[in-house]
Amino acid sequence: MQKIAGKAAASPKKGGAPNLLCVWASAEKPPPELARVTELHSLMPWGSLLRGMLGSDTEMRPGLAELCVPGAEFLITLNLHAWRPPVPEVGDHPEPTPESAMELLAPYYAAAGWTLEEARYFGAEELDALATSWTRRLGSTRDELDVLGITGVIGK
C-alpha cells in the first residue's frame, strides 16, 4: 500500500490520484471511511472474500452494500481454476457458470440489495483490461485463465 500511496501523491499529470484512500480492513467489517462508493470491484477474490461472494458468508455483502450509494455498479471476477481441483474456500459450491450464477447466486445477492444483471466468461482482452498484478500472475501460470465475470447494481 505504501508504494501505491506514494504514486497517488504525485500530481495528476504524473499519474497521481488525489482521491485515493488506502485501507487495511476486512470485507466483513469495512470501515465507514469508505462510504459513498459508486463502483465496487472484487477482482479474483480469495479466502473469506471468495466465500462471501459465493454466498457462504451472509454478513459480508450487506456490509459492503452499506458503503455504496444507491445504484452503485459492481464487478466480480471469479477465477474458475479455484474449482480445478477445488480449494477449501469454494466449499460445496459447484463451479459457477453464467447460467448457474444467475440462477443460484442471484438470490444470495438480492437478499443483500445486490441485483445481478449479467454473468459471462471473460475473454483475453477483458482480462488484460483488469490490469491487476494478481490477474497477470494467475495468467502467467497457465495456458488459459478461465474467469467468470458478474456485473450488476447495488441498492437499485
Swiss-Prot record:
Keyword Transferase: yes
Known EC number: 2.1.1.-
Keyword Ribonucleoprotein (UniProt): no
Gene3D superfamilies with a match to the protein in the record: Vaccinia Virus protein VP39
Keywords from the named record: Antibiotic resistance, Methyltransferase, Transferase
InterPro entries given in the database record: NpmA, SAM-dependent_MTases_sf
GO molecular function: methyltransferase activity
BP-aspect Gene Ontology terms: methylation; response to antibiotic
Family matches, as Pfam families: NpmA
Function: Modifies 16S rRNA so making ribosomes resistant to certain aminoglycosides.
Full protein name: rRNA methyltransferase
